[in-house]
């Protein structure tokens, strides 16, 4: 069974950077050694945002974006190797999620698409890459998402305590770690995505630091109720979503009914939307004793306070409190999934994704010997 140093690379729906994590992984433990966040150039970020909102590209433009993202991921890996004084031979493999540009797991021809050419990463780092993690699960009737609950279960499940892990990235997703029950998990809806999109358009800021804008505003209850009427929120699990659905266009359609509102009030309402949709799903799933939050949303003081208020009797903490960096959780998960793929072990959980069976995930792009 393969063990040793692995690197995980994650560029999520929030597009706030490329997260790269170095870890030692074997069948007994996952030990994080180092991490860094690598910036995404504004031009690349905008190109991804455009395609996620349905802007048409030529095949040439799409191919260039795929190559540019692959090079970006390779640069991020090489920066971490240099920082840690490591060589390619010191790493077993890279687990690279890729950049999701479309996710449509239902319908006549279900599909998901993550780009960032893994061949570029192999060529520029000299390290074997495991990528394309989601499509095997979709081929078996699943949603291909979320995949991280399997990792949450391996690291954070407790024999007697009802726990849930909440990742608040661009999209928020919940892992249900309930003793005596199959692991559950699904996307609850928007996490930081709509908040980030709004303040970017209104103030040119990538995110609402310390929730300053949201805390200066007031929740617009009619707007909140209008957004909560979206059918996604009442869909049963398994379910997954992404930027192709919850994007700035979605927000604009709801705002048409509310002209002239204060931008800070909209920011406050979007924060409340995230908190309410998450807390409702926690309660519908039977509640928990401890809710452990990871992802960028864990640094949003307003979100954390609202979750605690909406979930009385639940201890709301970040995963940092149990020794796992919330900022690095997803990248670490894909390093772990790469290890499982090379070990020939399944990486999905049918109880989470809805797939017909467990399966080894991903495609292997081997480095030259």
From Swiss-Prot:
Entry function: Catalyzes the specific phosphorylation of 1,6-anhydro-N-acetylmuramic acid (anhMurNAc) with the simultaneous cleavage of the 1,6-anhydro ring, generating MurNAc-6-P. Is required for the utilization of anhMurNAc either imported from the medium or derived from its own cell wall murein, and thus plays a role in cell wall recycling.
EC nos: 2.7.1.170
Name the record gives this protein: Anhydro-N-acetylmuramic acid kinase
Pathway stated in the Swiss-Prot or TrEMBL entry: Amino-sugar metabolism; 1,6-anhydro-N-acetylmuramate degradation; Cell wall biogenesis; peptidoglycan recycling
Family label: Belongs to the anhydro-N-acetylmuramic acid kinase family.
Organism, as annotated: Escherichia coli O45:K1 (strain S88 / ExPEC)
GO biological process: 1,6-anhydro-N-acetyl-beta-muramic acid catabolic process; amino sugar metabolic process; peptidoglycan turnover
Superkingdom to which the source organism belongs: Bacteria
EC class name: transferase
């Amino acid at each position: 069974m393969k063990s040793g140093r692995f690197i995980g690379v994650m560029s999520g729906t929030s597009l706030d950077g490329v997260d790269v994590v170095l870890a030692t992984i074997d069948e007994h433990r996952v030990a994080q050694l180092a991490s860094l966040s690598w910036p995404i150039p504004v031009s690349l970020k905008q190109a991804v945002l455009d395609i996620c909102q349905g802007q048409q590209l030529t095949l040439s433009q799409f191919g260039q974006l795929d190559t540019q993202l692959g090079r970006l991921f390779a640069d991020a890996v090489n920066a971490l190797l240099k920082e840690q004084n490591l060589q390619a031979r010191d790493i077993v493999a890279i687990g690279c999620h890729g950049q999701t540009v479309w996710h449509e797991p239902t319908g006549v021809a279900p599909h998901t698409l993550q780009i960032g050419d893994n061949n570029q990463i192999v060529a520029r780092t000299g390290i074997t890459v495991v990528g394309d993690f989601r499509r095997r699960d979709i081929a078996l009737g699943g949603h291909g998402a979320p995949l991280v609950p399997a990792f949450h279960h391996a690291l954070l499940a407790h024999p007697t305590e009802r726990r849930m892990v909440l990742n608040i990235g661009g999209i928020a997703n919940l892992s249900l770690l309930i003793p005596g029950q199959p692991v559950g998990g699904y996307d609850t809806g928007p996490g930081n995505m709509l908040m980030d999109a709004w303040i970017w358009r209104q103030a040119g800021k990538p995110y609402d630091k310390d929730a300053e804008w949201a805390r200066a505003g007031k929740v617009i209850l009619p707007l909140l109720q209008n957004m909560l009427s979206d059918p996604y929120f009442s869909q049963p699990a398994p379910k997954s979503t992404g930027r192709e659905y919850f994007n700035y266009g979605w927000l604009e359609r709801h705002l048409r009914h509310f002209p002239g509102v204060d931008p800070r009030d909209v920011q406050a309402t979007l924060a409340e939307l995230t908190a309410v949709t998450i807390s409702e799903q926690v309660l519908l799933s039977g509640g928990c004793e401890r809710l452990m939050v990871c992802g960028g949303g864990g640094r949003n003081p307003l979100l954390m306070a609202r979750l605690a208020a909406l979930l009385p009797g639940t201890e709301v903490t970040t995963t940092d409190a149990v020794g796992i960096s919330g900022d690095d959780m997803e990248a670490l998960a894909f390093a772990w999934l790469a290890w499982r793929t090379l070990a020939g072990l399944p990486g999905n959980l049918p109880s989470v994704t809805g797939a017909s069976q467990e399966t080894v995930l991903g495609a292997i792009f081997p480095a030259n010997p």
